[in-house]
């Protein structure tokens, strides 16, 4: 839980996750007539420990919703598309937009089409063939003569842009997890799965690239079960394989579906299943029912009685189990070959939740008690919305907002909770990639955007006349792992600072600080590509050429043994001087840093103890060994001394800083380096060479998987050893090798590296002197 709370909005340190989860959902009971009033009921009870308890709360809220709100929610789905890099997310999304009539022609990602995919609207995205920013759109899908409205967000697959996935999943109700039929579950698939679990996102799974040589959907499903530890079963089997892929058989109702037409836009249904697939269909159907019986009580009862469940019973069980996050139905096809995408849209309608089937909570910060509140997905309730994404547009800052409660009208006012300022909604739009369509109002469960609002990503907005001040929690923000110095080549006219401020506002994982010692601006982020993209954006969007330093690893400093300290700070230079004495102990701690005190007899007054805490925080920013942040230190002050004239807050802050340094150096200090999870894929003939390369950089191989044509090596390597790795990998695989890396943990670096880093730091300090 503490890991999540690190990303909490600054509204309140006690803010909890807004999404219903094991972290905290409280039962609020409200009468229907109170929906139009500005005050919601706050009958708070225990945290639901199971989905059944959570469902009781949802059902209670829905029983009191007006029919109009139920109907609008029934036709709405907020979904994201997530996957490992190059699994075909953007290609899949392009087909969704085409088949829903949102676009009139299909365009491909870089390398196949001069235009570029609709959702990759940045020039950099189209040039590099990757998604950098999550892009939002909306479209409509007709199923059973009913029109359904989708708010759809396409997310990046590269780990460097993981915050885009975090912010999208934070506001979505369901997702499509795209898995490659050849490579199966890969490193970033595992990361995306972890992010979906963090926000309790139900998902349907689409096995893509079924037209590729070596595709094996059932191996991929097995990996979903084993690696993601998510019960999964196919609800389709493919008709044909690889280049002969023609369609799929829906095993629930035993109907063959063929994609026809020049772009697969026509679906031909046939109850006559190909003869060679009948046994496979029955086998996979039996496996589906067996898997559902493990996760759904109603199907379990039918299964144990030896009866065959009906089509309606199977579909209802899949929906219940999927929304309860106990199961994921698996579909298959090929987005590039225009096969199977429409079936996924049907599955989104059938199996993913509508907004009123998800429990969202906020925290009422209008009182000191900070009561937790269940949000009501009704347009009649007071407005509550979360700003989850910012972009700089031609009309100023564009703010994406998810409406959780109430409605937002063009021309109306809302309050920015953090600042208390009243904000006018002068323009309200729905986004389609980088295009927009004006709307007059949006209701509960919708996603929209507005202009001219000064806020940060993760801020909450409430209705102007709301009595409650409901704060939504923000998304989880991971720590930066790499830094570099940056400076404009030419004299800065203010654009450099403007760009830095804007990028920080847009992206919480992009950090900027000024190092007073080196007099350099330091930018930090999630990887080399992450920072490289921002340097390139500076040039394109602001016309600023920048000089960058060598990438620096974000090391951490830690202690490995307990120690005590007794430190006195004395300074006399005429007049009142400075005096403070602090006594205590310091010991290693797993994870976060901690400051504590237990002073008997008032030897150190309360105001000076607060200064000690600030001195501790200051000391953590720059460790005594190499000037990097300190991790896992617990400082406890249990005694001290003051002077009637010379003691001050500054004295005790300085004394704590000195005591920290003294104790730290006596506590067997070590330097920690980031260890990355690395996944390398290459043709089989290069396996020996790649394994040798991993061993050469000191990596630890965790797993090797051999496919028909390619192999995959998963290893743990220090980030320091990964600089230049892409060049080495290209050289030893004739340009055919690929790799991804993701931060895993901090670990103690080798003694020789520690000595080298300390020597370099001391030399740097001597040069400055």
Swiss-Prot record:
GO cellular component labels: mitochondrion
Chief localization: mitochondrion
Transit peptide limits: 1-42
SUPFAM superfamilies: EF-G C-terminal domain-like, P-loop containing nucleoside triphosphate hydrolases, Ribosomal protein S5 domain 2-like, Translation proteins
Gene Ontology biological process terms in this record: mitochondrial translational elongation
Swiss-Prot/TrEMBL keywords: Elongation factor, GTP-binding, Mitochondrion, Nucleotide-binding, Protein biosynthesis, Transit peptide
The organism's place on the tree of life at top rank: Eukaryota
Cleavable signal peptide: none
Limits of the tr-type G domain: 74-356
Claim: Protein biosynthesis is one of the keywords in the record: yes
Short name of any one Pfam family annotated for the protein: EFG_III
Gene Ontology MF terms: GTP binding; GTPase activity; translation elongation factor activity
Membrane spanning residue stretches: none
Binding, GTP: 83-90, 154-158, 208-211
Pathway: Protein biosynthesis; polypeptide chain elongation
Family as reported in the entry's similarity comment: Belongs to the TRAFAC class translation factor GTPase superfamily. Classic translation factor GTPase family. EF-G/EF-2 subfamily.
NCBIfam families associated with the record: EF-G, PRK12740.1-5, small_GTP
HAMAP family: EF_G_EF_2_B (MF_00054_B)
Function: Mitochondrial GTPase that catalyzes the GTP-dependent ribosomal translocation step during translation elongation. During this step, the ribosome changes from the pre-translocational (PRE) to the post-translocational (POST) state as the newly formed A-site-bound peptidyl-tRNA and P-site-bound deacylated tRNA move to the P and E sites, respectively. Catalyzes the coordinated movement of the two tRNA molecules, the mRNA and conformational changes in the ribosome.
Protein name: Elongation factor G, mitochondrial
């Amino acid at each position: 839980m503490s890991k999540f709370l690190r990303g909490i909005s600054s509204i309140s340190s006690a803010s909890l996750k807004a999404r219903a989860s094991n972290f905290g959902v409280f039962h609020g009971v409200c009468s229907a007539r109170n929906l139009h009033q500005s005050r919601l009921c706050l009958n708070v009870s225990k945290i639901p420990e199971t989905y059944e308890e959570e469902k009781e709360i949802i059902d209670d809220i829905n029983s009191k919703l007006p029919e109009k709100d139920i109907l609008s929610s029934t036709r709405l789905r907020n979904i994201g598309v997530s996957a490992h890099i190059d699994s075909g997310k953007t290609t899949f999304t392009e087909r969704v937009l085409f088949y829903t009539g949102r676009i009139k022609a299909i365009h491909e990602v870089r390398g196949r089409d001069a235009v570029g995919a609709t959702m990759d609207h940045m020039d950099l995205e189209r040039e590099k063939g990757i998604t950098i920013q999550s892009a939002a759109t909306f479209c409509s899908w007709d199923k059973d003569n009913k029109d359904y409205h989708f708010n759809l967000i396409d997310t990046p697959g590269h780990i460097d842009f993981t915050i885009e996935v975090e912010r999208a999943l934070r506001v979505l109700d369901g997702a499509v997890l795209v898995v490659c039929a050849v490579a199966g579950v890969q490193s970033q698939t595992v990361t995306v799965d972890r992010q979906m679990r963090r926000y309790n996102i139900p998902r349907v799974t689409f096995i893509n690239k079924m037209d590729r040589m070596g595709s094996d959907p059932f191996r991929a499903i097995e990996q979903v079960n084993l690696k993601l530890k998510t019960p999964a079963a196919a609800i389709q089997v493919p008709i044909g394989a690889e280049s002969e892929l023609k369609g799929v058989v829906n095993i629930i109702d035993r109907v063959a579906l063929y994609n026809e037409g020049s772009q697969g836009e026509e679906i031909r249904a046939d109850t006559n299943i190909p003869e060679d697939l009948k046994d496979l269909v029955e086998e996979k159907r039996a496996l589906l029912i067996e898997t559902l019986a493990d996760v759904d009580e109603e199907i379990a009862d039918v299964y144990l009685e030896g009866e065959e469940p009906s089509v309606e019973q199977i579909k209802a069980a899949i929906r219940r189990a999927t929304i309860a996050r106990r199961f994921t139905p698996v579909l298959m096809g090929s987005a590039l070959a225009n096969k199977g995408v429409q079936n996924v849209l049907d599955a989104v309608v059938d199996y993913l939740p509508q907004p009123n089937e998800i429990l969202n909570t906020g925290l009422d910060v209008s009182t000191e008690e900070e009561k937790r509140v269940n949000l009501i997905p009704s347009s009649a309730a007071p407005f509550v919305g979360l700003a989850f994404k910012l972009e700089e547009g031609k009309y100023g800052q564009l703010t994406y907002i998810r409406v959780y409660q109430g409605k937002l009208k063009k021309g109306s006012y809302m309050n920015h909770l953090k600042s208390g300022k009243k904000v006018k909604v002068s323009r309200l739009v729905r986004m389609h990639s980088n295009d927009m369509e004006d709307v007059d109002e949006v209701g509960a469960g919708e996603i929209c955007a507005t202009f001219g609002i000064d806020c940060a990503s993760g801020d909450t907005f409430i209705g102007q006349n709301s009595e409650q001040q409901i704060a939504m929690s923000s998304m989880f923000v991971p720590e930066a792992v790499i830094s570099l110095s940056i400076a404009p080549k030419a004299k800065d006219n203010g654009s450099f600072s403007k760009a830095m401020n804007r990028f920080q506002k847009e992206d919480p994982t992009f950090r900027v600080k000024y190092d007073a010692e080196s007099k350099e601006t330091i930018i930090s982020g999630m990887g080399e590509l992450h920072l490289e993209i921002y340097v390139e954006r500076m040039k394109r969007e602001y016309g600023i050429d920048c000089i960058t330093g060598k990438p620096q690893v974000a090391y951490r400093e830690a202690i490995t043994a307990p120690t005590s300290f007794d430190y006195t700070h004395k300074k006399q230079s005429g007049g009142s001087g400075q005096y403070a004495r602090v006594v205590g102990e310091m010991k290693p701690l797993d994870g976060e840093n901690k400051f504590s005190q237990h002073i008997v007899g008032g030897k150190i007054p309360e105001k000076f103890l607060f200064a000690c805490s600030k001195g501790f925080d200051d000391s953590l920013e720059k460790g005594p060994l190499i000037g990097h942040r300190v991790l896992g230190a617990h400082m406890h002050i249990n005694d001290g001394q003051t002077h009637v004239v010379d003691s001050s807050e500054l004295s005790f802050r300085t004394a704590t800083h000195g005591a920290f340094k003294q104790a730290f150096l006596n506590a067997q200090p070590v330097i920690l380096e980031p260890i990355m999870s690395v996944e390398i894929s290459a043709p089989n003939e290069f396996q020996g060479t790649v394994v040798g390369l991993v061993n050469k950089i000191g990596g630890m191989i965790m797993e090797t998987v051999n496919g028909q044509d390619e192999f995959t090596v998963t290893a743990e390597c220090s980030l320091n050893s990964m600089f230049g790795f892409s060049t080495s990998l290209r050289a030893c695989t004739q340009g055919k090798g690929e790799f991804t890396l993701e931060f895993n943990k901090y670990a103690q670096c080798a003694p020789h590296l520690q000595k080298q880093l300390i020597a370099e730091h001391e030399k740097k300090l001597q040069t400055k002197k």
